[in-house]
């Protein structure tokens, strides 16, 4: 739950540069700056007559259409603050030229490395920016300010590398950031229109916020403000394609906006140094925000600490197509204090893998929240509460959960759902462990949803393990949702009339070519095999590739639960060897609806073993294994394949 302190003004920066500026020609021109070969007495209009210093650039009032290009490989210390504004048809562009590394700017402890004040129609591109002088203070990498400027337009910040901004970690609206676009209080109601923050890398070592857009024109009852109403949101804000990592506090935070879009961003590591309430990607005091196609992970706190957050002062925020994982605080928070507003939020078609503390947190008297068609997974040993509802000046008033898949191999308790005044829970799947407080659901499924390979996600575009296998009971058994967004996480159509699937996947059931995941052990890790006693993966004695499964002595085993179709015949093929011919090792299958099957291998070189089995009428899983029943010898296994019969030919070599 985040409350921004809106106090203070930036120290008057005008004094830093004096009061004398030079105006260049009215005709658009390109100016070159070379830190090693330039001279401020040059004209600056050719690479052979480049300027040299920031002092020269900062003394010029540039005209619409001008370009200021800094030589790659060059470096400058201090603040870059060129003057002037462009027009809608002719913005002023800061960029680079030449070859080599991006031009490097070090603010050296000033409040900004690159700064614009009451300026519009600017584009800042392809720079490397730091702000570090060995001591922390309130500072930013790129800082754009509107103070009594009315509506300022077209601020584009594109393709920059901002890192090592050694700001303090105080959480307030005027605090430190990698990239900050800010509207300050004044006598003229002011905002920004057409802001694009695109393709930047922010981090590592940025304190405290990665990307922040905020305003002192924030006051309205929705944000629990009882003062003079002055909310004046920025419009046409797009924050996309940015990579934010190792930030002291929050990752990406659009505040006081209307219709902002936050998409295709990655936040890797937030709240690394702050110790305050923070989240990965969240919006505040903003209407009609869309947050989609993002990934947030490695959040380092349970003070909030979710990958994503619909914070208070909001209406109609949509959170969709995002991937959250390994965040200490959880996946998703929807929150408001008692007299504020958070209404009509939608959370849909997202995937959460091993998020901590609270997968979902509902805090305060939020209203009309819809959470549907999400897939949530917890692996063994996790203790997160699947849903956690608590008071913040009142308990949640109304929330609905539909068509979600909770695949819980372990979990904490479901907390506080009896406090939600109007709580609807329908057509959800809860599979695995069933802990205290689990909500009633007249159309609940507790059957295995048959995810292709849960727990295998490695990135936003690498989560196919959360699709549904053919025969899944989650296929076509969801609830129709009006205005459902029209597509799932992978872009499959979601009909307005046909029943949807449960979970984030709405495509047809998947028939994998080999249900045995990591059958060749080439991930270098045991998962999703489960070892018992002395089982491990080693980079020696592999039949093919680099890695093999090893059992040292007996009894010991490695097992894997695979997804299968009912009433279907399969063959399991694998290769094994033992270091002592008198001590067999078994390749086998069990728990498939029939009698356990195995073949014994006693050879001291890799020998192929095959077993055939037919699943039961209701069986959707089977357990394959490599088992050494006794002895002291070491056994190895590799290249396990499960296929529908007819089995692979004898001369086939599995990949």
Task: Label every model-predicted segment.
Residues 464, 469-511, 578, 650, ...:
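Surface beta-loop-beta hairpin patches that serve as ligand-binding interfaces in beta-rich domains
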Residues 81, 107-115, 135-148, 170-195, ...:
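Extracellular beta-strand/beta-solenoid scaffold signature
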Residues 67-69, 75, 85-137, 164-172, ...:
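Right-handed parallel beta-helix/beta-spiral solenoid domain characteristic of secreted/periplasmic
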Residues 35-71, 75, 80-81, 472, ...:
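Acidic Gly/Asp/Thr-rich repetitive segments characteristic of extracellular carbohydrate-active
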Residues 78, 83, 89, 318-324, ...:
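Predominantly extracellular beta-rich ligand-binding scaffolds that present long acidic/polar faces
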Residues 510-655:
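Extracellular and organelle-lumenal recognition/adhesion modules and their flexible linkers in secreted
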Residues 78-79, 127, 131-133, 137, ...:
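Surface-exposed loop/turn segments connecting beta-strands in extracellular beta-rich domains
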């Amino acid at each position: 739950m985040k409350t921004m302190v809106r106090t203070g003004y930036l120290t008057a920066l005008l004094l830093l540069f004096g009061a004398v500026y030079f105006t260049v020609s009215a005709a658009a021109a390109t100016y070159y700056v070379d830190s090693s070969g330039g001279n401020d007495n040059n004209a600056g209009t050719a690479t052979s007559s480049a300027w040299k210093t920031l002092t020269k650039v900062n003394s010029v009032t540039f005209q619409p259409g001008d370009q200021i290009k800094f030589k790659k490989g060059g470096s400058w210390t201090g603040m870059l603050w060129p003057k002037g504004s462009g027009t809608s048809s002719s913005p002023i562009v800061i960029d680079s030229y030449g070859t080599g590394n991006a031009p490097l700017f070090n603010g050296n402890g000033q409040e900004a490395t690159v700064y614009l004040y009451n300026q519009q129609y600017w584009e800042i591109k392809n720079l490397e920016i730091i702000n570090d002088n060995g001591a922390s203070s309130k500072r930013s990498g790129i800082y754009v300010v509107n103070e009594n400027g009315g509506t300022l337009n077209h601020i584009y910040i594109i393709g920059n590398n901002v890192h090592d901004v050694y700001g303090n970690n105080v959480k307030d609206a005027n605090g430190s950031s990698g990239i900050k676009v800010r509207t300050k209080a004044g006598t003229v109601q002011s905002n920004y229109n057409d802001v694009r923050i695109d393709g930047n890398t922010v981090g590592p070592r940025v304190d405290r916020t990665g990307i922040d857009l905020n305003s002192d024109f924030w006051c309205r009852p929705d944000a629990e403000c009882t003062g003079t109403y002055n909310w004046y949101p920025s419009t046409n804000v797009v924050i996309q394609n940015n990579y934010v990592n190792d930030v002291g506090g929050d990752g990406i935070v659009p505040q006081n906006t209307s219709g902002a879009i936050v998409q295709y961003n990655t936040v890797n590591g937030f709240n690394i140094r702050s110790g305050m309430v923070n989240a990965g990607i969240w919006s505040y005091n903003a209407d009609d925000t869309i947050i989609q196609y993002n990934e947030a992970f490695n959040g380092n706190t349970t003070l909030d600490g979710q990958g994503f957050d619909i914070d208070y002062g909001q209406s109609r925020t949509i959170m969709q197509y995002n991937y959250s994982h390994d965040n200490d605080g959880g996946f998703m928070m929807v929150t408001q204090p008692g007299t504020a507003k958070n209404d009509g939020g939608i959370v849909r078609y997202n995937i959460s893998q091993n998020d901590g503390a609270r997968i979902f947190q509902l805090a305060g008297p939020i209203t009309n929240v819809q959470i549907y068609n999400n897939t949530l997974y917890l692996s063994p040993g996790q203790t997160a509460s699947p849903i956690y509802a608590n008071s913040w000046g009142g308990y949640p008033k109304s929330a609905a959960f539909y068509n979600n898949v909770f695949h819980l191999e372990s979990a904490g308790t479901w907390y506080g759902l009896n406090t939600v005044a109007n709580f609807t829970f329908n057509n959800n799947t809860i599979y695995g462990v069933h802990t205290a407080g689990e909500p009633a659901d007249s159309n609940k499924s507790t059957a295995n949803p048959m995810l292709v390979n849960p727990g295998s996600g490695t990135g936003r575009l690498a989560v196919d393990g959360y699709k549904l296998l053919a025969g899944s009971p989650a296929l076509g058994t969801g609830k129709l949702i009006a205005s459902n967004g029209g597509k799932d996480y992978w872009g499959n159509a979601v009909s307005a009339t046909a029943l949807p699937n449960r979970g984030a996947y709405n495509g047809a059931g998947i028939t994998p070519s080999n249900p045995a995941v990591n059958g060749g052990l080439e991930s270098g890790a045991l998962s999703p095999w489960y070892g018992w006693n002395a089982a491990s993966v080693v980079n020696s004695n592999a039949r093919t590739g680099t890695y093999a499964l090893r059992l040292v002595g007996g009894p010991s085993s490695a097992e894997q639960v695979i997804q299968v179709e009912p009433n279907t015949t399969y063959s399991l093929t694998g290769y094994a060897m033992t270091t002592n011919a008198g001590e067999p090792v078994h390749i086998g299958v069990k728990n498939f609806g029939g009698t356990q099957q195995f073949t014994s291998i006693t050879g001291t070189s890799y020998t192929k073993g095959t077993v055939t089995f037919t699943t039961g009428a209701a069986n959707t899983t089977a357990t394959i294994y490599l088992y050494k029943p006794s002895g002291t010898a070491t056994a190895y296994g590799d290249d396990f394949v499960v296929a529908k019969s007819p089995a692979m030919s004898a001369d086939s070599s599995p990949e």
